[in-house]
């Protein structure tokens, strides 16, 4: 196998005509990879992605060829995938106003050019989910919000419309399934690419704790920060630490590592109904 790319979290290998996508235990916040791994994180992301790919298979095609036909040293954290020509934008859907989206709304009254009602508070539910794309930055650089017009400039109007529709369809269906299991999906990012037959296909990961914000339904209360089953916990620690959000990043304390792993395990078990390990 040939290593083609080492990303913030995943390594991509070529194996004949297929790709082997390996999820590491690395974690990144603010587009910077932290030096401290989260044990089992790669396996948890892979298992949850596979569950979601199966749940949403009738809604949108995905890149999975096999979860078992992978090198033994990568068992549990790798997927054999079809090659995709990836779209050069990050496709983001938001159903709740939080994080960078809330900060942008406070400045402008909009998110990625989408005008929103006045007076919304932190974690407010939006009237309808919105498509808020961003650039796809290299490792070490920051993704930047772009408008729908910016997507049109990059991929054309027809493809931009399809990206928006698929992203919002995935979000709505995922949010519906998760709500029935006690989880709110505040927002999520998906990556799409063209398969060899010209089909727009979901790649990378799907509705995981790295790509989404997950909140417990039972404690949801707009107007404040929410308990989260995702890497928001690490983002919050990084902000409190005084780190300037530039590389190199500080080591994570042991208690932050343990609490982060516990969150990833909890949401996997709540969503899938399966016991981890």
Curated annotation (Swiss-Prot):
Keyword Membrane appears in the UniProt entry: no
E.C. no: 6.3.2.6
Enumerate the catalysed reactions.
Answer: 5-amino-1-(5-phospho-D-ribosyl)imidazole-4-carboxylate + L-aspartate + ATP = (2S)-2-[5-amino-1-(5-phospho-beta-D-ribosyl)imidazole-4-carboxamido]succinate + ADP + phosphate + 2 H(+)
One GO molecular function term of this record is:
ATP binding
A GO cellular component annotation here is: cytoplasm
Which top-level enzyme class is recorded in the Swiss-Prot or TrEMBL entry? ligase
What Pfam families does its record include?
A: SAICAR_synt
Q: Which family does it belong to?
A: Belongs to the SAICAR synthetase family.
| Record protein name field | Phosphoribosylaminoimidazole-succinocarboxamide synthase
Species of provenance? Salinispora arenicola (strain CNS-205)
């Amino acid at each position: 196998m040939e290593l083609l790319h080492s990303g913030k979290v995943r390594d991509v290998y070529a194996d004949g005509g297929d790709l082997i996508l390996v999820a590491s235990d690395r974690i990144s916040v603010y587009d910077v990879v932290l030096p401290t791994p989260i044990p089992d994180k790669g396996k948890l992301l892979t298992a949850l992605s596979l569950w979601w790919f199966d749940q949403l298979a009738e809604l949108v095609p995905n890149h999975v060829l096999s979860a078992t036909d992978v090198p033994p040293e990568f068992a549990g954290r790798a997927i054999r995938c079809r090659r995709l020509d990836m779209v050069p934008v990050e496709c983001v859907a938001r159903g709740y106003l939080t994080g960078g989206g809330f900060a942008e709304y406070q400045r402008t009254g909009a998110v990625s050019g989408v005008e929103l009602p006045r007076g919304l508070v932190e974690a407010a539910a939006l009237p309808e989910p919105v498509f808020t794309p961003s650039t796809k930055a290299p490792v070490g650089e920051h993704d930047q919000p772009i408008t729908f017009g910016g997507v049109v400039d990059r991929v054309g109007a027809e493809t931009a419309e399809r990206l928006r529709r698929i992203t919002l369809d995935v979000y709505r269906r995922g949010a519906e399934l998760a709500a029935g299991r006690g989880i709110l999906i505040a927002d999520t990012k998906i990556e799409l690419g063209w398969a060899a037959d010209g089909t727009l296909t979901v790649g990378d990961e799907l509705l995981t704790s790295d790509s989404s914000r997950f909140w417990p339904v039972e404690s949801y209360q707009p107007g404040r920060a929410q308990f989260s089953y995702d890497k928001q916990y690490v983002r919050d620690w990084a902000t409190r630490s005084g780190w300037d959000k530039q590389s190199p990043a500080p080591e994570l304390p042991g208690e932050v590592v343990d609490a982060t792993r516990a969150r990833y395990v909890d949401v996997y078990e709540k969503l899938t109904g399966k016991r981890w390990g």
